[in-house]
């Protein structure tokens, strides 16, 4: 990938474009992310950078993590992530990656952990059809057939069943960057992105450009 950054989802709002049209946007506090380690082909077998984001009290980190940050000369952060960037050699340890690495009009992919919905049935979890809601029917929101009796006389693997919904890594592709506010490290993305407010998100240039 060419560029990437970690950020915190702040919430949604709406703005007006130059034609007066209302655009729903998600506000993301993107960075600053500090480079704390560089991976090289000679030492690690591949090239990448390790970045840290988000303040945290030092006493909440264990000694190995504190030592890792001390070696880089950087204050302890909450999140650590590794990116394989094309120009990782141009970045130095201690350098900050900020929101202005992206520009308005660019397309990005955003990853995050989706909101947890708890235990849900097949109608909400998989968009299954309901049964008849009247005329004497006793089948309304049940699962339905899970496998015939004599053949195959079992339930196949990966059958769509009730269960835990949400709280999984989710990526939304090809979202538009509407506006950058560099002095506040804010990126405004058209539409919604995965996760709750204050959730961690990863922004990178899109793979489908």
Curated annotation (Swiss-Prot):
Family annotation (InterPro entries): Ribosomal_uL3, Ribosomal_uL3_bac/org-type, Ribosomal_uL3_CS, Transl_B-barrel_sf
One Pfam family this sequence matches: Ribosomal_L3
Region spans: Disordered: 141-163
Keyword Ribosomal protein part of the UniProt annotation: yes
Keywords: Ribonucleoprotein, Ribosomal protein, RNA-binding, rRNA-binding
GO cellular component: cytosolic large ribosomal subunit
GO MF annotation terms: rRNA binding; structural constituent of ribosome
Gene3D superfamilies: 3.30.160.810, Translation factors
GO biological process: translation
Top-rank taxon, per record: Bacteria
Protein family according to the UniProt entry: Belongs to the universal ribosomal protein uL3 family.
Subunit record text: Part of the 50S ribosomal subunit. Forms a cluster with proteins L14 and L19.
PANTHER family: 50S RIBOSOMAL PROTEIN L3, LARGE RIBOSOMAL SUBUNIT PROTEIN UL3C
NCBIfam families: L3_bact
Protein role: One of the primary rRNA binding proteins, it binds directly near the 3'-end of the 23S rRNA, where it nucleates assembly of the 50S subunit.
Entry protein name: Large ribosomal subunit protein uL3
Organism expressing this protein natively: Clostridium botulinum (strain Hall / ATCC 3502 / NCTC 13319 / Type A)
């Amino acid at each position: 990938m060419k560029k990437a950054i970690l950020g915190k989802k702040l919430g949604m709002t709406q703005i007006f474009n130059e034609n007066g049209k209302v655009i729903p946007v998600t506000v993301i506090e993107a960075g600053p992310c500090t480079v704390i380690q560089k991976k090289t082909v000679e030492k690690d077998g591949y090239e990448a950078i390790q970045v840290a984001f988000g303040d945290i009290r030092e006493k909440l980190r264990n000694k190995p993590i504190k030592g890792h940050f001390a070696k880089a000369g950087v204050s302890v952060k909450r999140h650590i992530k590794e990116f394989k960037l094309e120009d990782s050699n141009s970045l130095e340890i201690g350098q900050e990656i900020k929101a202005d690495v992206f520009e308005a009009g660019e397309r990005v992919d955003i990853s995050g952990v989706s909101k947890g919905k708890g235990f849900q049935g097949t109608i909400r979890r998989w968009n299954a059809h309901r049964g008849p809601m009247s005329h004497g029917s006793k089948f309304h929101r049940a699962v339905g057939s899970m496998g015939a009796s004599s053949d195959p006389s079992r339930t196949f693997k990966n059958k769509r069943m009730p269960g835990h919904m949400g709280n999984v890594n989710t990526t939304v592709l090809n979202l538009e960057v509407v506006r950058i506010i560099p002095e506040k490290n804010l990126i405004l993305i058209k539409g919604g992105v995965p996760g709750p407010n204050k959730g961690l998100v990863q922004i990178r240039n899109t793979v489908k450009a």
